[in-house]
Amino acid sequence: AAAISCVGSKECLPKCKAQGCKSGKCMNKKCKCYC
């Protein structure tokens, strides 16, 4: 999966859910998705 840049964790959640993942958070300016 391509790295998704982010500023805050709340912007990762919809992007991760769009990839079929349950949740996600922002770490080191990249989204980390938990599938």
Curated annotation (Swiss-Prot):
Biological classification of the source: Eukaryota, Metazoa, Ecdysozoa, Arthropoda, Chelicerata
Protein localization: Secreted
Pfam families membership: Toxin_2
Listed name of the protein: Potassium channel toxin alpha-KTx 23.2
UniProt superkingdom: Eukaryota
Source organism of this protein record: Vaejovis mexicanus smithi
Recorded GO CC terms: extracellular region
Stored InterPro entries: Scorpion_toxin-like_sf, Scorpion_toxinS_K_inh
Family (UniProt): Belongs to the short scorpion toxin superfamily. Potassium channel inhibitor family. Alpha-KTx 23 subfamily.
